[in-house]
Amino acid sequence: IGTTTISGVVLEKNETQKARILEAKTIENGSFLATDSDWERIQDAENIVKKSRQMLDDFLDRYPEVEKIGLTGQMHGIVYIDKEGTCVSPLYTWQDARGSLCEEKNGSLTEEIQQTCKVQAASGYGMVTHIYNLRHNLIPDTAVSFCTIMDYFGMQLTGRKEVLVHASNAASFGFFDAQKNTFMTEELYKMGVEEPWLPKVCTGIEALGSYRERIVTTAIGDNQASFLGAAGNEKNTLLVNM
């Protein structure tokens, strides 16, 4: 699930476990929402889910032997989720610039984070967006947590109510300790973010549930997915992009 396009691919493994592409398809995302603020870059999360589900259903109808459904997509951005696992906000994309706005005497939020927490977090990172939204009362009252758009798609497919985010996507939010695979709760607390907001994190590819009798797995970041697509999962592999 990208920012400008949504893509799907049907893969089949042969006897050597090499993946063979049976079909690939890309459509326009076209879900940006009009806004009065030129720094705001938000998308219609439910429209994205609708388009993604239509593509998936088309594949499943024509390839009934499919066994598993893997997910990936645009990193950094967040949608807010209520206790029923339903999206209650637009998708705040990685292009959103609210974290770079100058506020009173403190400069921008990203500068304040660097000074207060010694953490490098760019505008568009989920935690930066969340901190800004907290301070400006922009979060819906029913929201209890947040996740990426592909995490939300997985929840909608499986009926899951609790957010589960792969470490690759959790790290893209910012304020994440990649060595410990946990959020920096002490630093987040300094910025007003309490632990109950934070989504549960997994380090492996886990089963979220099922859709049309196929296993749906946790979404990984598009950066990681592109590496696997180009280099595979062989150990000690280096990929150089020019």
Label the predicted regions.
Residues 96:
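Carbohydrate-associated surface elements
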